[in-house]
From Swiss-Prot:
InterPro entries: DNA_mismatch_repair_MutH, DNA_rep_MutH/RE_typeII_Sau3AI, DNA_rep_MutH/T2_RE_sf, Restrct_endonuc-II-like. The lineage of its organism: Bacteria, Pseudomonadati, Pseudomonadota, Gammaproteobacteria, Enterobacterales. Belongs to the MutH family. Keywords: Cytoplasm, DNA damage, DNA repair, Endonuclease, Hydrolase, Nuclease. It is found in: Cytoplasm. GO terms for biological process: DNA modification; mismatch repair. SUPFAM superfamilies: Restriction endonuclease-like. The keyword Nuclease applies. Coiled coil: none annotated. This is DNA mismatch repair protein MutH. Sequence-specific endonuclease that cleaves unmethylated GATC sequences. It is involved in DNA mismatch repair.
Amino acid sequence: MFPLVPLRSPPATEEQLLHQAQRVAGHTLGELAALAGLPIPQDLKRDKGWIGVLLELWLGASAGSKPEQDFAAMGVELKTIPVDSQGKPLETTFVCVAPLTGNTGVTWETSHVRHKLKRVLWIPIEGDRAIPLAERRVGAPLLWSPDEKEDRQLCQDWEELMDMIVLGHVERITARHGEVMQLRPKAANSKALTEAIGARGEPILTLPRGFYLKKNFTGALLARHFLLKT
């Protein structure tokens, strides 16, 4: 058996990616951080993306924060997902930043959301806050693409939310809009404003928004794959 080390370059195939993800499964974040030489924070309050960075390092991800998928050559996106002891998601999952202007002619088929969700490597992580960060274990990976029903659900929510953005109602969108996907402000501070369209078609400044998958959606896909009780 080869020693467990981070991939130094992006994997060439899905099989290689999945194999590395399966080798990482069962290890704690502390073990993986030590082997990779990555300092481990006390908690995630100021380092929200730390787990993602650690897994990207181990799996040889290439994109960083660029708009293409994490494994651009294969078109695969990496998503870590904190779960409870029953394997149920503890929080919503960020997909991408929502475009608030320049949306003429954009369709679901050509949208950034669909591009990002076309092929996803889900990696569940123990998320119980009672477990110290270094002791939380990495779960078994799942390589997923939306089936017809999931694609339809995502499409309906995307169209509803984009219609509201285009018609100048972005400020009226709440986290309750959407069955499986929601639109929420995404900004570290409330001073980071971006341009959008107002109710009368005028330019306005508002908080950047992001698309997030709701827990009912990610919970169902994990349950189906891992045969969990919902």
